[in-house]
Regions:
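Core catalytic lobe of class I
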Residues: 1-227
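Short mixed-charge
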Residues: 3-4, 240-246
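Short alpha-helix adjacent to the SAM-binding motif of class I
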Residues: 225-236, 240
Length: 246
């Protein structure tokens, strides 16, 4: 898959490009309205490089835009991609942004600055810690939850701490999320056939969660190799073939 191309994967669409590209998003979304934004953007923690000392032979690719940057730069980056998808949101919508402790404040500030509401902080509690250089090894990731305007929540009184095992280490992506966790968020905030947007789809876990819950995923990924991984995972799951769009 090449930059600028868009593929149809059953009821889903995948574009290779930048989540801040307004024209690309307009083509991808077309006349649809997005009910859920569920994204795992780069955290500005250089996740692959920071672990290179642990495993010098690691085959993981560097994540695009994951270099260490200032809070101000990261807030501007977040504001830009939020503003790009904002015109395509349904009147009732939900926003889920995975993030790290380090970039929590700039992300919340960007959500508020773009007119969004920061409602709650959810925690993905992993069953094992992530090895690294910090004094306290992280065993969690944060999920910023909010919306623009109004929202719908389908499950009464879910919990803010979401316990799911970290996926086994995979060559497909260094920060892969559990499909079960994504399914839970999608089911809480959308109905069958509604649209879920992921502008940083990585290896495609959000798209697979949409396939399993009968939602439509509109996805963007900057890295062509990860785009191909998304297509391969979906084709293996469904037995269908992705088709390039004109």
């Amino acid at each position: 898959m090449k930059p600028g191309e868009t593929y149809q994967l059953g009821q889903h669409r995948l574009a290779c490009g930048d989540a801040s590209d307004v024209a690309l998003i307009k083509r991808l979304v077309d006349k649809d309205k997005v009910h859920v934004v569920l994204v795992d953007p780069p955290y500005s923690v250089a996740v692959v490089q920071s672990k290179q000392w642990l495993n010098p032979k690691s085959q993981h690719k560097t994540i695009s835009n994951d270099g260490l940057v200032s809070d101000e730069t990261y807030e501007a980056f977040t504001t830009t991609w939020l503003e790009a998808i904002k015109p395509h949101l349904a009147p009732r919508n939900s926003i889920y942004i995975f993030n790290s402790d380090k970039m929590l404040l700039p992300t919340v500030q960007a959500l508020k600055a773009s007119g969004g509401k920061f409602a709650q902080l959810l925690i993905w509690a992993k069953t094992q810690a992530v090895v690294g250089r910090l004094d306290y090894l992280p065993q969690h990731e944060l999920i910023i939850y909010g919306w623009y305007g109004r929202h719908i929540f389908h499950k009464s009184k879910d919990k803010s701490i979401l316990v799911y095992p970290k996926p086994n280490r995979s060559k497909q992506h260094p920060t892969m999320k559990p499909v079960g966790l994504l399914r839970r968020l999608i089911l809480n905030s959308s109905s069958v056939s509604e649209v879920v947007y992921d502008g940083f789809v990585g290896s495609g876990s959000t798209l697979l969660a949409c396939e399993q819950t009968n939602r439509r995923c509109l996805a963007i990924e900057l890295d062509p190799e990860y785009c191909q991984t998304v297509i391969s995972r979906w084709e293996r799951l469904t037995g269908q073939k992705a088709e390039i769009l004109p």
